[in-house]
Amino acid sequence: MSFEQAMKELETVVGQLERGDVALDQSIALYERGAALKKRCEDELKRAEEKVAAITLDSNGQPTGTKPVEGL
């Protein structure tokens, strides 16, 4: 499942829970599914953030390479 698919399903789950028109057992199942989807999306975002890099420049402003972006 892609990040986008997981987010879309998570939005659907949240919408169902917010409406409050589902039985308790179904609400619990939806909550558990939502928690799993949230974790999956957070993990995917963390992996993506770790891949982000800043371009380093020399004293003349020329690119010399990349380094990880701190604070992400």
Swiss-Prot record:
GO terms for molecular function: exodeoxyribonuclease VII activity. This is Exodeoxyribonuclease 7 small subunit. It is found in: Cytoplasm. Its EC number is 3.1.11.6. GO terms for biological process: DNA catabolic process. Belongs to the XseB family. NCBIfam families: PRK00977.1-3, xseB. Bidirectionally degrades single-stranded DNA into large acid-insoluble oligonucleotides, which are then degraded further into small acid-soluble oligonucleotides. Keywords: Cytoplasm, Exonuclease, Hydrolase, Nuclease.
